[in-house]
A protein has these predicted regions:
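Active-site nucleophile-adjacent alpha helix/oxyanion-hole segment immediately C-terminal to the catalytic cysteine
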Residues: 117-187
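Context-gated lysine
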Residues: 5, 10, 19, 33, ...
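Conserved active-site-adjacent core of cysteine acyl-enzyme catalytic domains
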Residues: 1-69, 178-212
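Weak global preference for isoleucine
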Residues: 2, 7-9, 27, 32, ...
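Intrinsically disordered, low-complexity regions
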Residues: 41, 74, 90, 100, ...
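Proteins with a high burden of low-complexity, intrinsically disordered sequence enriched in S/T/G/P/A and R
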Residues: 84, 98-101, 161-163, 208, ...
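Proline-rich intrinsically disordered, low-complexity coils
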Residues: 23, 51, 71, 95-98, ...
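Non-catalytic propeptide/linker segments at domain boundaries
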Residues: 75-136
Length: 212
Protein backbone atom coordinates (compact mmCIF):
# COMPACT_ATOMS: atom_id res chain seq x y z
CA UNK A 1 0.00 0.00 0.00
CA UNK A 2 1.32 3.41 -0.98
CA UNK A 3 1.75 5.85 1.89
CA UNK A 4 2.52 9.57 2.02
CA UNK A 5 4.39 11.29 4.83
CA UNK A 6 4.53 15.05 5.17
CA UNK A 7 7.76 16.79 6.15
CA UNK A 8 7.65 20.52 6.90
CA UNK A 9 10.73 22.48 5.87
CA UNK A 10 11.21 25.31 8.35
CA UNK A 11 15.01 25.31 8.42
CA UNK A 12 17.88 23.49 6.76
CA UNK A 13 17.90 21.07 9.69
CA UNK A 14 14.34 20.03 8.74
CA UNK A 15 15.79 17.94 5.91
CA UNK A 16 17.25 15.58 8.50
CA UNK A 17 13.69 14.48 9.29
CA UNK A 18 13.68 12.68 5.94
CA UNK A 19 15.91 10.01 7.51
CA UNK A 20 12.93 8.94 9.63
CA UNK A 21 10.44 9.07 6.74
CA UNK A 22 12.47 7.37 3.99
CA UNK A 23 13.75 3.75 4.18
CA UNK A 24 17.46 3.72 5.03
CA UNK A 25 18.50 1.99 1.79
CA UNK A 26 17.13 4.95 -0.20
CA UNK A 27 18.74 7.87 1.56
CA UNK A 28 22.16 8.95 2.81
CA UNK A 29 23.86 12.16 3.87
CA UNK A 30 24.72 12.95 0.25
CA UNK A 31 20.98 13.22 -0.48
CA UNK A 32 20.38 15.38 2.59
CA UNK A 33 23.24 17.76 1.74
CA UNK A 34 22.16 18.11 -1.89
CA UNK A 35 18.61 18.97 -0.86
CA UNK A 36 19.89 21.50 1.65
CA UNK A 37 22.23 23.08 -0.92
CA UNK A 38 19.93 23.16 -3.94
CA UNK A 39 16.43 23.47 -2.46
CA UNK A 40 17.26 25.11 0.84
CA UNK A 41 14.32 27.17 2.08
CA UNK A 42 12.80 27.62 -1.37
CA UNK A 43 10.26 24.92 -0.51
CA UNK A 44 8.23 24.56 2.67
CA UNK A 45 6.98 20.98 2.38
CA UNK A 46 8.11 17.58 1.12
CA UNK A 47 5.68 14.70 0.76
CA UNK A 48 7.37 11.31 0.81
CA UNK A 49 5.67 8.67 -1.40
CA UNK A 50 6.61 5.05 -0.69
CA UNK A 51 6.77 2.57 -2.28
CA UNK A 52 7.25 3.83 -5.81
CA UNK A 53 8.04 1.57 -8.77
CA UNK A 54 10.30 3.60 -11.03
CA UNK A 55 10.45 2.34 -14.61
CA UNK A 56 13.97 3.67 -15.14
CA UNK A 57 15.43 2.07 -12.04
CA UNK A 58 13.62 -1.22 -12.73
CA UNK A 59 15.01 -1.23 -16.28
CA UNK A 60 18.53 -1.31 -14.80
CA UNK A 61 17.58 -3.60 -11.93
CA UNK A 62 16.56 -6.48 -14.21
CA UNK A 63 19.60 -6.31 -16.49
CA UNK A 64 22.22 -5.49 -13.86
CA UNK A 65 21.43 -5.14 -10.15
CA UNK A 66 19.48 -8.40 -9.89
CA UNK A 67 22.61 -10.25 -11.05
CA UNK A 68 24.92 -8.84 -8.39
CA UNK A 69 26.09 -10.81 -5.37
CA UNK A 70 24.90 -8.09 -3.01
CA UNK A 71 21.08 -7.93 -2.96
CA UNK A 72 19.43 -4.76 -4.23
CA UNK A 73 15.80 -3.87 -3.67
CA UNK A 74 13.23 -2.97 -6.32
CA UNK A 75 11.37 -0.27 -4.44
CA UNK A 76 12.06 3.44 -4.76
CA UNK A 77 10.38 6.47 -3.24
CA UNK A 78 9.47 9.92 -4.50
CA UNK A 79 9.92 13.25 -2.78
CA UNK A 80 7.20 15.65 -3.91
CA UNK A 81 8.30 19.26 -3.52
CA UNK A 82 5.81 21.98 -2.59
CA UNK A 83 5.78 25.62 -1.55
CA UNK A 84 2.62 27.29 -0.29
CA UNK A 85 0.67 24.28 -1.62
CA UNK A 86 2.03 24.81 -5.15
CA UNK A 87 3.55 21.71 -6.75
CA UNK A 88 7.14 22.08 -8.00
CA UNK A 89 7.93 18.51 -9.07
CA UNK A 90 9.51 15.39 -7.63
CA UNK A 91 12.80 13.63 -6.94
CA UNK A 92 13.11 9.83 -7.09
CA UNK A 93 15.33 8.05 -4.57
CA UNK A 94 16.63 4.59 -5.51
CA UNK A 95 18.47 1.83 -3.55
CA UNK A 96 21.81 2.22 -5.33
CA UNK A 97 25.32 2.89 -4.01
CA UNK A 98 26.00 5.80 -1.64
CA UNK A 99 26.30 9.06 -3.54
CA UNK A 100 24.14 7.82 -6.44
CA UNK A 101 20.71 7.53 -4.83
CA UNK A 102 19.05 10.50 -6.56
CA UNK A 103 17.32 9.11 -9.62
CA UNK A 104 14.77 10.45 -12.10
CA UNK A 105 13.98 14.06 -11.23
CA UNK A 106 11.59 16.64 -12.63
CA UNK A 107 11.69 20.04 -10.91
CA UNK A 108 10.35 23.41 -12.00
CA UNK A 109 13.49 25.48 -12.71
CA UNK A 110 12.17 28.52 -10.81
CA UNK A 111 12.80 26.46 -7.69
CA UNK A 112 16.53 26.24 -8.43
CA UNK A 113 17.60 29.39 -10.28
CA UNK A 114 17.01 33.10 -9.86
CA UNK A 115 18.87 34.66 -12.79
CA UNK A 116 17.52 34.92 -16.34
CA UNK A 117 18.21 31.83 -18.43
CA UNK A 118 17.22 30.14 -21.68
CA UNK A 119 15.99 26.64 -20.89
CA UNK A 120 14.59 23.70 -22.84
CA UNK A 121 11.39 22.77 -21.02
CA UNK A 122 8.39 20.52 -21.52
CA UNK A 123 5.27 19.71 -19.51
CA UNK A 124 5.81 16.34 -17.83
CA UNK A 125 3.10 14.55 -15.86
CA UNK A 126 3.15 13.16 -12.34
CA UNK A 127 0.31 11.28 -10.66
CA UNK A 128 0.07 12.16 -6.98
CA UNK A 129 -2.71 10.69 -4.81
CA UNK A 130 -4.92 10.22 -7.85
CA UNK A 131 -4.28 13.72 -9.18
CA UNK A 132 -2.42 14.42 -12.41
CA UNK A 133 0.14 17.17 -11.88
CA UNK A 134 2.00 19.08 -14.59
CA UNK A 135 5.69 19.92 -14.21
CA UNK A 136 7.33 22.28 -16.69
CA UNK A 137 10.84 20.91 -16.51
CA UNK A 138 13.85 19.27 -18.13
CA UNK A 139 14.60 15.66 -17.09
CA UNK A 140 17.57 15.02 -14.82
CA UNK A 141 19.08 12.11 -12.92
CA UNK A 142 22.43 11.43 -11.26
CA UNK A 143 24.68 8.85 -12.86
CA UNK A 144 25.38 5.48 -11.32
CA UNK A 145 28.78 3.92 -10.86
CA UNK A 146 28.79 0.96 -13.21
CA UNK A 147 25.73 0.83 -15.49
CA UNK A 148 24.37 4.27 -16.36
CA UNK A 149 27.47 6.42 -16.26
CA UNK A 150 27.88 9.96 -17.57
CA UNK A 151 27.26 9.38 -21.29
CA UNK A 152 24.30 7.04 -20.71
CA UNK A 153 22.70 9.60 -18.41
CA UNK A 154 23.24 12.44 -20.89
CA UNK A 155 21.65 10.34 -23.65
CA UNK A 156 18.73 9.58 -21.32
CA UNK A 157 18.01 13.27 -20.71
CA UNK A 158 18.03 13.91 -24.46
CA UNK A 159 15.74 11.02 -25.40
CA UNK A 160 13.40 11.67 -22.46
CA UNK A 161 13.01 15.34 -23.38
CA UNK A 162 12.69 15.00 -27.15
CA UNK A 163 10.73 11.73 -26.96
CA UNK A 164 8.05 13.39 -24.85
CA UNK A 165 7.94 16.72 -26.67
CA UNK A 166 8.15 15.65 -30.31
CA UNK A 167 6.49 12.72 -32.05
CA UNK A 168 9.45 12.15 -34.38
CA UNK A 169 11.69 10.98 -31.54
CA UNK A 170 11.50 7.89 -29.35
CA UNK A 171 11.60 7.91 -25.55
CA UNK A 172 13.65 5.28 -23.71
CA UNK A 173 14.42 4.05 -20.23
CA UNK A 174 18.02 4.09 -19.07
CA UNK A 175 18.10 0.28 -19.23
CA UNK A 176 16.99 0.32 -22.88
CA UNK A 177 19.76 2.77 -23.70
CA UNK A 178 22.32 0.49 -22.06
CA UNK A 179 20.99 -2.52 -23.98
CA UNK A 180 21.06 -0.64 -27.30
CA UNK A 181 24.64 0.55 -26.88
CA UNK A 182 26.97 -1.01 -29.45
CA UNK A 183 30.01 -2.62 -27.88
CA UNK A 184 32.08 -4.92 -30.05
CA UNK A 185 35.10 -5.00 -27.74
CA UNK A 186 33.66 -5.90 -24.35
CA UNK A 187 30.69 -6.19 -22.06
CA UNK A 188 28.03 -3.51 -21.68
CA UNK A 189 27.96 -3.63 -17.88
CA UNK A 190 29.78 -2.70 -15.78
CA UNK A 191 30.60 0.28 -18.00
CA UNK A 192 33.46 2.75 -17.75
CA UNK A 193 31.82 5.13 -20.22
CA UNK A 194 31.08 5.53 -23.92
CA UNK A 195 33.06 6.84 -26.88
CA UNK A 196 31.67 9.63 -29.11
CA UNK A 197 31.00 7.03 -31.82
CA UNK A 198 29.02 4.86 -29.39
CA UNK A 199 26.93 7.84 -28.28
CA UNK A 200 26.31 8.80 -31.91
CA UNK A 201 25.25 5.26 -32.86
CA UNK A 202 23.03 5.05 -29.79
CA UNK A 203 21.17 8.28 -30.57
CA UNK A 204 20.65 7.16 -34.17
CA UNK A 205 18.48 4.35 -32.80
CA UNK A 206 16.09 7.02 -31.52
CA UNK A 207 15.80 9.04 -34.76
CA UNK A 208 18.53 11.59 -34.00
CA UNK A 209 21.13 12.61 -36.57
CA UNK A 210 24.29 13.29 -34.55
CA UNK A 211 27.33 15.06 -35.98
CA UNK A 212 30.74 14.27 -34.48
Amino acid sequence: MISFKRIEIKSLESYNNLKNAVPSQLIDMDVIKRLQNYLGLRCDEIRVEYPYYDSDYLSTYYIHYSQKLRPYGKLCCRLHILKEEEYYGYITLRPTAPGTKIGKTFLTPELLIRENAYLMLHNFKAHVVGNEMQIKSFPWKSQETDISVCAHTAAWTITRYFGNKFRDYADATIGELVEHTSNDWGRKTPSLGLTPVQVSDLLKNYNFSPLI
